[in-house]
């Protein structure tokens, strides 16, 4: 967990508490919230492709909120399961990919090679962040952090959409993600050497 995530998490969870209470009151399935969040991100990505930045921002923000609520709701209802965790992680990868893919296709339709390159660099590097953690954990190395994790990626993505600075946002996401990948590779190497 990054420093920013650690500091913001308590305040963020407090803000989400009324929503968690509402869904908990009606016993809404956390997995349903997970899938609905993916639907919202998909819809938001479609509007991002259409360059309707206001609708894209609102839908992607709601999708990100749904992704935050599902875990808290599962804990509240005591419905935490291995499948739920697996589904959440799987859906997260699709949610990460959809906005970058939408931007890549959008830029390609205008023949904007720089935009296409930045979109797919952001996609690949963000997947690298997720993969290094998953692979390290399969080797028994846990607790990997980094300066630019999923929370930071989404903050930059949403901020760049709101400000209309999409290419700058993609560049920051790519750079931050690559730094985090190298951090995790280095930390994993050190941890595995200690285990020998």
Swiss-Prot record:
GO cellular component: membrane
UniProt keyword list: Transferase
Gene Ontology terms describing biological process: glycerophospholipid biosynthetic process
Presence of keyword Thylakoid: no
Entry GO MF terms: phosphotransferase activity, for other substituted phosphate groups
Record flagged with keyword Cytoplasm: no
Record InterPro entries: CDP-OH_P_trans, CDP-OH_PTrfase_TM_dom, CDP_ALCOHOL_P_TRANSF_CS
Family of this protein: Belongs to the CDP-alcohol phosphatidyltransferase class-I family.
Protein name as it appears in the record: Uncharacterized protein aq_1480
Organism: Aquifex aeolicus (strain VF5)
Lineage of the organism: Bacteria, Pseudomonadati, Aquificota, Aquificia, Aquificales
